[in-house]
Curated annotation (Swiss-Prot):
Claim: Iron-sulfur is one of the keywords in the record: no
Family recorded in the similarity comment: Belongs to the enolase family.
Enzyme class: lyase
Source organism of this protein record: Methanococcus aeolicus (strain ATCC BAA-1280 / DSM 17508 / OCM 812 / Nankai-3)
Name of the protein in its database record: Enolase
HAMAP family in the record: Enolase
Task performed by this protein: Catalyzes the reversible conversion of 2-phosphoglycerate (2-PG) into phosphoenolpyruvate (PEP). It is essential for the degradation of carbohydrates via glycolysis.
Binding-site residues for (2R)-2-phosphoglycerate, renumbered to this chain: 164, 337, 366-367, 388
GO MF annotation terms: magnesium ion binding; phosphopyruvate hydratase activity
GO biological process, one term: glycolytic process
PROSITE patterns: ENOLASE (PS00164)
Keyword Cytoplasm annotated: yes
Amino acid sequence: MDNSFDILDIKAREVIDSRGNPTVEVEVLTAGGYGSAIVPSGASTGTHEAVELRDKSQRFGGKGVLVAVDNVNSIIAPELIGFDSRTQREIDTYMIELDRTANKGKLGANAILAVSMAVAKAAASTASLPLYKYIGGCNSYIMPVPMMNVINGGEHAGNALEFQEFMIMPVGADSISEAIRMCAETYHTLKKVIVSKYGKNASNVGDEGGFAPPVSDIRETLDLLTDAVKMAGYEDEITFALDCAASEFYNKDDNKYIVKGAPLSSDQLISLYKEICDEYPVISIEDPLDEEDFEGFASLTKELKGVQIVGDDLFVTNTERLKKGIEMGAGNALLLKVNQIGTLSESIDAANLAFRNGYGVVVSHRSGESEDNTIADISVALNAGQIKTGAPARGERTAKYNQLIRIEEEIGYPKYAGKNIRCPF
């Protein structure tokens, strides 16, 4: 009997993320390997996300995670010692049962997820396999198209833009390494465009490494992207994507969206999206409406047939909410954030449900990130075809891109998803 996969030790600690806020790191030791994981944290979060447990004490302005760390060390770890690290679903289910809440609010999704990811990495290490191959097997070979957030707004920046992310997608590249190069060159060109129009101080960056120029107009922002792409020479290779995070500028009291100070109805906002997609090469829109507006999402999906409509706050990587969306035709793609649901197994379940119903999958980071590059491996393991992990700047973002370059080199003959983002096969 092979005991090398048996879990010998689990240890959690408090570390800091890219915003200087505390988060949970977990190390798992097996008889034959080792894995560690750091969980991310979001700024604009969906109401239905699993609970990120915070101490709410004076330390770190109430954002400490010592309670979550103690939950790992005192409650979860003693229960999992001796488990076979390959039994990922059994381990994840066991932790969910230990928590006994619908939203992981007792132990904390940040505690549970850190253990879940570290267990997978320890098992992969014990098997002498890269994580993407351990999770996905020999059929994991598709490299995702990056959605690079090069202009930040909303909750991620200090400017007046309502929309949270303006992204570039190099669908015309031939490989992930070429895609990253195209985006990096465009990013540097964009900086020159911004500095020439607004001055050097306008080149400051937001949480995800994108620039945060002093603009408030959506079209003006898209014009900046258009100019940068043209100047970089990639007009035929690079398209645009938006993350509107509409729940953040939705006024529930009067059922209006506040855009540049003007109240817009759902229908008026949908008309704005149609105009933008006619005027610019926008191929993907994330969270265009409020997180509870399944009907509005369904209407927009019908109106913009050639555009990917991504549910983030709408679905929160939750299979029950995704099932509702599928039944109603709300959106046609899932944004997969592992910390929204809290375990690796449940994240994979959500991705598989999306794939089975013709939905695309975008594996995503959070605005509060770390050097952990697990999501790069997950994107390849699932053959997702798309990854969203910020600008080609800041170490917590480039860690994921550099891991994708390594994976591409290791696979040898990968397929780059390119224009087939929702169905990369």
